[in-house]
Regions:
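Polytopic transmembrane helical bundles with strong interfacial aromatic enrichment
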Residues: 22-333
Length: 333
């Protein structure tokens, strides 16, 4: 039986073949500071799109401009009053982000030697185009809850892709992985991080349906408990066994901190929207800003889980076993 680590890290000399040597070269590229900072700018504007969209929904401004892509059948800027300010602002930020995404795709092809990185940049471009199309469908079909929720999910997916591009273009991530720790535990850390991302996506879908009037709040609140358990489990695993790896410890601490903040914001949002929401207009500003903060923190929480999953894949390969005929003892490669 031969045991060997499998993951995003570079294979060891004992198991490296010519094909794996080619894989090693495909995982590295010269660091380009302009590329990295451009990716950071794109991720920042992707986050602004989420905040602007949350403001549109919270202020019930989704139909303030009833046509798309024009505004009141013209491309001229409308009078920025009432809900038009939120909806038109959201569209302008989203449009600029699309331009940034076109640029990041072109720059990535030009300067990044990693084929998978080029594919990721184009996936990001395709994702934001899908988000724009869903935005049009949402407006033209009078805000159907399922489409509005899909629009929000795709938007946060693009934000996570933009964050991943920004992460993987940083100086320390353009070269080979230097330090790894083989994971022998069940479930593996990679499995836990992927589970964390999954339950957060479920929570995003449930929250979107509740927020857009497609379902009641019970499922969203119940799944919040599931999210808290899974993310705490994942963070504790990292902090207990991999605290010496900054690449894992930092996103784990960030994820745990954001989780606590998100639970608090979720409770405040529940009070303002569900408990106090029918008592009068004086609660509306608090309802709007607590909900927007809840959405924004949720996006950061999902991005932190994605970053942790990437880092686990890079730094903590899973120990797998392969049966070799005629052998009786384990050989560690």
């Amino acid at each position: 039986m031969i045991r060997y680590p499998v993951g995003f890290g570079v294979p060891g000399p004992a198991c490296e073949s010519g094909k794996e040597s080619l894989l090693r070269s495909s995982l590295t590229t010269p660091y380009n500071s302009a590329h990295h900072y451009y990716a950071l700018l794109t991720a920042f504007f992707a986050f602004l799109v989420i905040i602007a969209g949350a403001l549109v929904t919270s202020n019930e401004a989704g139909l303030a401009i009833p046509d798309w892509p024009t505004s009141f059948h013209t491309f001229r800027m409308p009078h920025m009053v009432g809900g038009v300010l939120y909806e038109y602002g959201h569209r302008m930020i989203a449009g600029f982000t699309i331009l940034l995404t076109v640029g990041i795709a072109v720059v990535t092809v030009a300067v990044d030697k990693r084929r998978w990185m080029r594919k990721l940049a184009f996936i990001g471009f395709a994702t934001i185009l899908i988000q724009a199309i869903l935005g049009r469908v949402t407006v033209m079909n009078l805000l159907p809850p399922a489409v509005s929720t899909a629009h929000a999910i795709v938007g946060q997916t693009f934000f996570c892709i933009a964050v991943a591009i920004a992460l993987l273009t940083a100086c320390r991530y353009t070269g080979e992985v230097q330090k790894t720790a083989v994971d022998r535990r069940k479930p593996s850390l990679i499995a836990l991080t992927l589970l964390s991302v999954l339950v957060l996506y479920v929570q995003l879908a449930l929250g979107g349906m509740f927020r857009h009037g497609g379902m009641s709040w019970e499922a969203h609140v119940f799944n919040a408990i599931v999210v808290a358990i899974v993310l705490t489990w994942t963070s504790v695993r990292v902090l207990s066994y991999y605290s010496d790896l900054d690449a894992l410890r930092r996103p784990a601490i960030m994820m745990l901190s954001l989780l606590m903040a998100q639970l608090c914001l979720g409770f405040i949002s529940f009070l303002t929207k569900v408990v106090w929401g029918q008592k009068g207009a004086q609660t509306q500003p608090m309802m709007v800003w607590s909900t927007v903060a809840h959405v924004a923190t949720g996006a950061l929480l999902l991005a932190s889980a994605v970053v942790l999953a990437i880092q686990a894949w890079r730094h903590v390969p899973v120990l797998q076993e392969e049966r070799v005929p005629g052998t009786r003892k384990a050989v560690t490669a």
